[in-house]
Amino acid sequence: MSPTSVAIALPIETKLLTPLYDWGRRFDWSHVKEAHIIHIVKKNVTPLEFGLVEMPDESTFKEMVPTLEKFLRDEAQKILPPSFRGECYFHLSRDFSPEEEMITLLKKTNVSVVVVSTRGKHGLDGIFHSSFTDKMVRFSPCDVYVVRPE
């Protein structure tokens, strides 16, 4: 059965975007009614002399939103073919755990498949690197399609 709704976990690294462009050109979009383009900004907490600082904070994130929204739209045009006639939704948020936020979003949108791009870590790098892709494969409520850089 072909998926009728697809989520694309959009990274910002060029190395990880290229495989998504290739996948988008090869994928049969004729049966897809919804495409969800998702990017989650990772929040970090940094200890400083005067206390803990959360980055990006709420005001910084609000300043980033217009640029990130444009980025999502621009990248969607590179991934989705001009012949795509379904609805396209953009999701942008921030969280300490982008993986958990993504899983929550996947449950809310009830997509058939999520497409993620992996760094392709192998050997010791793979053992010590807990990746977004690994968590999607383990905990996603839908099918996961993994694309890899060449």
What are the roles of these predicted feature ranges?
Residues 56-71:
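A short acidic, glycine-rich active-site loop
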